UniProtKB/Swiss-Prot annotation:
Belongs to the purine/pyrimidine phosphoribosyltransferase family. GO terms for biological process: adenine salvage; AMP salvage; purine ribonucleoside salvage. CDD domains: PRTases_typeI. This is Adenine phosphoribosyltransferase. The gene is apt. The lineage of its organism: Bacteria, Pseudomonadati, Pseudomonadota, Gammaproteobacteria, Methylococcales. It comes from Methylococcus capsulatus (strain ATCC 33009 / NCIMB 11132 / Bath).
Length: 171
C-alpha cells in the first residue's frame, strides 16, 4: 500500500482552515497506481456474486466505474438532485453543517441485486450510510462498502452500523 499512499497528496487548510485534504488526483493520473488501487479495492469481493457497483458523487464515480468494469458488472451512479433524467428515488440526510440529498434512477437496482458501494473517502460516514439506505430502498442488498481512503479518527465505519467495510489506506 506504500505505492498508493505515495500518490495521495496532502493539502493543508483545504477547503477551509484546519482541514487536511487528501487529494487523490495524483493517484488517478498514474495508470499503474490506478490499476493497483482498483485491483486492491475489488479483490476481496471477487466471486461474491456482486451484481452492481454503486458510486457516490462525484469521486466515487471514478473508482466505482472502474471497480464495476474490473468485476464485470454494471455501474450505478448515486447523484446530487436534479442530475438524473428519469424517475428517481431520493434520500435526504444530515451533514455536519446542513443537509444533502442523493438520487438514483428507480429502475437502476432491485430485488436480487447485491451491490458494492464505492467512494474515494470514508470520513464521518453520513454520505455512505445514506447511500446504503438509498440502494436498499430499491430492494437491493448492500454486499459491502469499499473506500480508497478511510479517516479513522472520524469513525465513519461505526456510522455504517456493522456493514462490511474495506478501505485501502487508513489515516
Amino acid at each position: 500500500m506504500d505505492k498508493l499512499r505515495a500518490k495521495i497528496r496532502d493539502i493543508p487548510d483545504f477547503p477551509k482552515p484546519g482541514i487536511l485534504f487528501r487529494d487523490i488526483t495524483p493517484l488517478v493520473k498514474d495508470p499503474a497506481a490506478l490499476r493497483l488501487a482498483i485491483h486492491q479495492l475489488v479483490h476481496p469481493f471477487v466471486g461474491e456474486d456482486i451484481t452492481a457497483v454503486a458510486g457516490m458523487e462525484a469521486r466515487g464515480f471514478i473508482f466505482g466505474a472502474l471497480a464495476a468494469w474490473e468485476l464485470g458488472v454494471g455501474f450505478v451512479p448515486l447523484r446530487k438532485p436534479g442530475k438524473l433524467p428519469y424517475n428517481v428515488q431520493s434520500i435526504d440526510y444530515d451533514l455536519e453543517y446542513g443537509s444533502a440529498r442523493l438520487e438514483v434512477h428507480l429502475d437502476a437496482l432491485g430485488v436480487g441485486d447485491r451491490v458494492l458501494m464505492v467512494d474515494d473517502l470514508l470520513a464521518t460516514g453520513g454520505t455512505a450510510r445514506a447511500s446504503c439506505s438509498l440502494v436498499e430502498s430499491l430492494g437491493a442488498e448492500v454486499a459491502a462498502c469499499a473506500f480508497v481512503i478511510e479517516l479513522d479518527a472520524l469513525e465513519g465505519r461505526e456510522a455504517l452500523h456493522g456493514r462490511r467495510v474495506h478501505s485501502l489506506l487508513h489515516y
